[in-house]
């Protein structure tokens, strides 16, 4: 299969990246980050999450962030809404696209959200119904697709079943997440071969963590399988809560550099992206997690 000519990147840094940060980050800093990402040419930015501040204190100001960002025409500003209450809060904040998530691992589902996979999927039914009524689009996430911290390996057929359910419920796209970063290029190709029998390839996305240094190889393997949508995080924000000190999300800057080298169009200005990553890294008081940004700044 030939490589896609164009790739769409889903920027998850402001949500998935910042949610695990221990230090408080101001609404103003979050707004500045989102605006910088819009200006760099990203077409989709996951801005925040409408969850209980008790569980994810870092996401407490998501409604304020949505109220203050400069919305660029043509850019989608999404939010995670894991339950109906979260969806209603997102709706009140003027959010036009939400994401829901399920796990491919029963043990992870029980430990993370305290219910079975089938129970978690059933919880999304009222969200999908309300989203349809209000003209809100819904994106689906499946976590632990290439390994689980509690169960170990996960069968691709299990991932396909969960992805199929999300797609059948009305998720226009389903992102497959290597939550603990143990996936390899071979396993990634097999995963998409199996899942694409249940969900069309053009409706699938890849979400890779770099915990074992495999994210770029897995993205390339996905491209070979015809996948043309990837989630990534500015400056590699977002560590891995299951491997202390290890890197988590793949850095958007590094993915753009890879795609540029392959002649694949993204519409993203790499220099502006690097600057946005350096800015939020300065706010956090640590170096960027992007290898490309580090190499550029050392020149």
PLM-predicted stretches and their roles:
Residues 1-299:
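Catalytic cores and adjacent flexible loops of soluble metabolic enzymes
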């Amino acid at each position: 299969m030939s490589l896609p000519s164009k790739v769409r990147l889903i920027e998850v840094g402001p949500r998935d990246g910042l949610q695990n940060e221990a230090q408080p980050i101001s609404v103003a800093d979050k707004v500045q980050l989102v605006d910088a990402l819009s200006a760099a040419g990203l077409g989709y930015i996951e801005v925040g999450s409408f969850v209980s501040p008790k569980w994810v204190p870092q996401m407490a100001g998501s409604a304020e962030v949505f109220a203050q960002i400069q919305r660029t025409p043509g850019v989608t500003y999404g939010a995670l809404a894991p339950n109906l209450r979260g969806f209603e809060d997102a709706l009140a904040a003027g959010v036009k696209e939400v994401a829901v998530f399920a796990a491919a691992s029963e043990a992870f589902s029980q430990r993370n959200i305290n219910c079975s996979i089938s129970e978690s999927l059933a919880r999304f039914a009222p969200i999908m119904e309300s989203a349809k009524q209000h003209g809100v689009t819904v994106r689906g996430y499946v976590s632990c697709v290439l390994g689980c911290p509690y169960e170990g390996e996960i069968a691709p057929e299990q991932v396909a079943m969960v992805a199929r359910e999300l797609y059948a419920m009305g998720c226009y796209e389903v992102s497959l997440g290597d939550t603990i970063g143990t996936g390899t290029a071979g396993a990634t190709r097999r995963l998409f071969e199996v899942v694409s029998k249940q969900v069309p390839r053009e409706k699938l996305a890849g979400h890779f963590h770099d915990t074992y240094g495999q994210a770029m190889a897995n993205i390339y393997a996905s491209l070979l399988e015809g996948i043309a949508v990837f989630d990534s995080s500015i400056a590699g924000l977002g560590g891995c809560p299951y491997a202390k000190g290890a890197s988590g999300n793949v850095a958007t800057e590094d993915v753009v550099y890879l795609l540029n080298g392959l002649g694949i169009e993204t519409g993203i200005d790499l220099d502006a992206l690097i600057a946005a990553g350096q800015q939020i890294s300065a706010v956090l008081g640590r170096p960027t997690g992007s290898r490309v940004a580090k190499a550029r700044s050392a020149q």
